[in-house]
Amino acid sequence: SGSFDPITLGHVDIVTRAAELVDEVVVGVAMNSAKNGIFSMDERVAFVNDAVADIPGVEVALVDGLLVDFCTEMGADAIIRGLRFGGDFDYELQMAHLNKAMSGIETILLPAGREFGTISSSMIRSAACNGGNVSEFVPEMVNAALHERFPH
């Protein structure tokens, strides 16, 4: 799960690899009140649906509340999270322990691919709003929406 504001090719890579490991992947699009988003929840869900449409065994759902509650409702056996280079590991490990303690659900951490390890949605937002070309980091639909949102 994530806020996917916007979804990046790094996210798509993690979903693709996760789908190779398990029978079914549910991508949870979550609200994150701590982040200032640029796209609405409906837009984000649409972008994620479009980006993962060709990956077998993947569905997209809205997460409203705790991730572990969502996982329990969906009958999930595990949470799969991507790790970028740098500081993600410590945070994700803490969350994995908390989620396990609250629900018994395990977390699988997948390292980002080399080409995606430094990409984050916040970096994409920052670059796009300042006129940067982010086309090699986001799905085509997202790139078009960013150009519409931040015309330069």
Where are the regions a protein language model picked out?
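Nucleotidyltransferase catalytic core that binds NTPs
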Residues: S1-H152
